[in-house]
């Protein structure tokens, strides 16, 4: 079973929501389980797209209330871990697609790269080492179709555990 994470802000622009919805739809069409933080914004839009295409959505919730998941999450996992639940999302996913996002998304990207997970940035953070090179495992996509293709291809990036 392939599981891909979709990460991004709990609040997002209409454009980011549309990108996330399209990512979710395309993941579902590939038979992929979508894992996310289960909240609003990018997470909700991605789950909506996945459900519209008949997919499975898994929300790793920060709190202990299953009912806090957005209405498009079909499998809600309350953790009571707060933002620390981000590491559960990262470790559950085989790769992650970041759409937009703020500091929480940036922390997920860093954790994913640290654990050797491929991260696809779709109008999200673009990171560079001090020498100007991108970190291994971070790839920029131009559109949802490319983001999903990149997330599904190849082996996970080499990490530094």
Which role fits each region the language model picked out?
Residues 7-11, 23, 82-155:
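C-terminal binding/interaction regions
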């Amino acid at each position: 079973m392939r599981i891909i994470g979709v990460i991004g802000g709990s609040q997002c622009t209409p454009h980011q929501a549309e990108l996330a919805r399209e990512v979710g739809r395309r993941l579902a069409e590939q038979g992929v389980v979508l894992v996310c933080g289960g909240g609003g914004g990018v997470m909700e839009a991605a789950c909506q797209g996945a459900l519209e295409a008949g997919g499975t959505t898994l929300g790793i919730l920060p709190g202990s209330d299953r009912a806090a998941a957005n209405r498009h999450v079909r499998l809600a996992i309350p953790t009571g871990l707060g933002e620390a639940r981000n590491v559960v999302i990262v470790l559950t996913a085989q790769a992650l697609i970041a759409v937009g996002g703020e500091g929480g998304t940036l922390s997920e990207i860093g954790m994913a790269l640290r654990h050797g997970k491929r991260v696809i940035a779709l109008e999200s953070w673009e990171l560079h080492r001090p020498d100007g090179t991108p970190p291994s495992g971070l790839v920029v996509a131009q559109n949802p179709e490319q983001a999903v293709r990149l997330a599904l291809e190849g082996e996970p990036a080499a990490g530094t555990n």
